Amino acid sequence: MPVYVEFDVPADLADDALEALEVARDTGTVKKGTNETTKAIERGTAELVLVAEDVSPEEIVMHLPELADEKGITLAFVETQDEIGQAAGLEVGSAAAAIIDAGEADSDVDDITAKIEELR
């Protein structure tokens, strides 16, 4: 497990988070990539942040969990960058993504957030 992964997210919960990202991509607003995700967290506009566990070097996303904690934003870990990229509508992987406006996935994001807070 990478240094920056603070807790294990069950596979079904990670899948739910990826589904919510897909729905938010189509009906709301998402930010893709580490830089855009970092800005969304700093501005406090992110509702849910997804970070891949297979990022190398780890330093690329190492700051995200701490920053999200400071801002009170829920963060979920998923296995691969490719999963995040695909859910965000990219043809390549993405180390991180943020849901800004969940759109039709609003209740899903609320459920995911509650479940992740229980894990911590």
Curated annotation (Swiss-Prot):
It is found in: Cytoplasm. GO terms for molecular function: ribonuclease P activity; rRNA binding; structural constituent of ribosome. Its main location: cytoplasm. InterPro entries: Ribosomal_eL30-like_sf, Ribosomal_eL8/eL30/eS12/Gad45, Ribosomal_eL8/Nhp2, Ribosomal_eL8_arc. One of its GO terms (cellular component) is ribosome. It comes from the Archaea. GO terms for biological process: translation; tRNA 5'-leader removal. Keywords: Cytoplasm, Ribonucleoprotein, Ribosomal protein, RNA-binding, rRNA-binding, tRNA processing. Part of the 50S ribosomal subunit. Probably part of the RNase P complex. Belongs to the eukaryotic ribosomal protein eL8 family. Multifunctional RNA-binding protein that recognizes the K-turn motif in ribosomal RNA, the RNA component of RNase P, box H/ACA, box C/D and box C'/D' sRNAs. This is Large ribosomal subunit protein eL8. The gene is rpl7ae.
